[in-house]
A protein has these predicted regions:
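Ubiquitin-like/PB1-type beta-grasp interaction modules and other compact soluble beta-rich domains
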Residues: 1-65
Length: 66
């Protein structure tokens, strides 16, 4: 399955949820904002949202600064 993540092509061998992709990419439980095909997802949707071939994602890690 081919995905575009933050403007870069990614290929994954199995179907995944957004949560599974975040885990594979090393985000774990870090706070992130995810946009899937130009639609922002609530964090509660990450585990139940299945990815499809050709999906476009933007993932932004939230960090605090001072």
């Amino acid at each position: 399955m081919k995905l575009q993540v933050n403007g870069t092509a990614h290929e994954v061998a199995v179907s995944l949820t957004v949560r599974g992709l975040l885990d594979q990419m090393g985000f774990g439980e870090k706070p992130v904002v995810v946009e899937l095909n130009q639609r922002a997802l609530f964090p509660r949707e990450h585990a139940s949202t299945e990815l499809s071939d050709g999906d476009v994602l933007e993932i932004v890690q939230i960090s605090a600064g001072g």
